[in-house]
């Protein structure tokens, strides 16, 4: 795993957590793999240059990471492909986001995938102060520029 000079990395081996801010580059294998029980936390605007294979947690939610309140300005961009792995017993890939539960234009954390997305990932949304409102298209939490199945993110 190679890192760019602009990368700040925190690796707590006992908890198997990686915090990326602002850039994490997967250069040797082209992929960052999160094992079950592992986590990638990304607060602010971060880029993973490469592919992401996850059987663990992707934490964009300040609530889950112990950050400062339920901020809705976190974004992780994966420049390659994404694979969410799930072992069928309810454990596996998951994504946590903070979102103001309101109309279509509500503030939210976002996951952006420039390539294809496959597999299954459960999505956990923390309400960041919204009172609820009607939506026409829904709140855009996840953008996949390539191909993805309807059940890739549940």
Language model regions located:
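Extracellular beta-solenoid/beta-roll
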Residues: 1-122, 126-127, 131-154
